[in-house]
């Protein structure tokens, strides 16, 4: 299919630091709290909660941890009120960057995000300065395994309403519209498939190739952002050099 998700080249870097430092469950737990407060504790009637639970399971979050987060948001346990904010700006060499945060202190979050930008030669911008370069898309990532036929999986995904299907080195990447994400995910789940990733994310219209020096600076910026407990997601349009390792 046309287009490239660049999941391993770019998106695999997102989450690597989280997993390494044990932060991913905390961040998903906050997403669950927000989803429950907005739409209630039943995944059957709360599409956003269904999506977050799918993301949690794709990240191997234990069921009891998921349930505890739901109870916390339902008022059965003490819950914090979080505010959702998206910061926009430019990384080194003008890389377009979106930073989603869930925070109980927006002044703290704004200061931390601004520091991450400026430390590596970037700068925060005004609302709308780069968001027009991205589209909200569903992305489902499936690990390649023996017995999983690529053509069958592609037809399964496209028949369910997927927009695109990519085969990469170790994974298949299914892209959907935001509206069809839940339908496609549920259709693939019904076939017994497990996901490495299943979530709505901001995907750039085009990618910008960067050199190794810029990649090193930008990865440092990503590390600082992703190590912040308030930061939920970081999206960008940088294409790292082939074979580059931090």
Curated annotation (Swiss-Prot):
The keyword GTP-binding does not apply. One of its GO terms (molecular function) is DNA binding. Belongs to the TACO1 family. Keywords: Cytoplasm, DNA-binding, Transcription, Transcription regulation. PANTHER family: TRANSCRIPTIONAL REGULATORY PROTEIN YEBC-RELATED, TRANSLATIONAL ACTIVATOR OF CYTOCHROME C OXIDASE 1. It is found in: Cytoplasm. It comes from the Bacteria. This is Probable transcriptional regulatory protein CLK_2466. It holds the Pfam family Transcrip_reg. GO terms for cellular component: cytosol. GO terms for biological process: regulation of DNA-templated transcription. Gene3D superfamilies: 1.10.10.200, 3.30.70.980.
């Amino acid at each position: 299919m046309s287009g490239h998700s660049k999941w391993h080249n770019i998106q695999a870097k997102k989450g690597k630091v989280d997993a390494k430092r044990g932060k991913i469950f905390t961040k998903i737990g906050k997403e669950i709290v927000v989803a429950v407060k907005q739409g209630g504790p039943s995944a059957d009637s709360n599409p956003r909660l269904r999506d977050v639970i799918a993301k949690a399971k794709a990240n191997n979050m234990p069921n009891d941890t998921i349930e505890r987060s739901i109870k916390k948001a339902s008022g059965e346990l003490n819950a914090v009120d979080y505010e959702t904010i998206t910061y926009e700006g430019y990384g080194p060499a003008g890389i377009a960057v979106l930073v989603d945060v869930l925070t109980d202190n927006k002044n703290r979050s704004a200061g931390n995000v601004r520091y991450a930008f400026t430390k590596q030669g970037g700068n925060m911008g005004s609302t709308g300065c780069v968001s027009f370069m991205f589209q909200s898309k569903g992305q489902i990532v499936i690990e390649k395994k023996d017995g999983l036929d690529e053509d069958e999986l592609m037809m399964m995904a496209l028949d369910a309403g997927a927009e695109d299907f990519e085969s990469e080195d170790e994974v298949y990447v299914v892209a959907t519209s935001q509206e069809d994400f839940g339908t496609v995910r549920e259709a693939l789940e019904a076939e017994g498939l497990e996901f490495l990733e299943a979530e709505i994310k901001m995907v750039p219209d085009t990618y910008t190739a960067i050199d190794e020096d810029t990649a090193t600076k930008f990865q440092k910026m990503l590390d600082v952002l992703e190590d912040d407990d308030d930061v939920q997601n970081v999206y960008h349009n940088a294409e790292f050099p082939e074979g580059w390792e931090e």
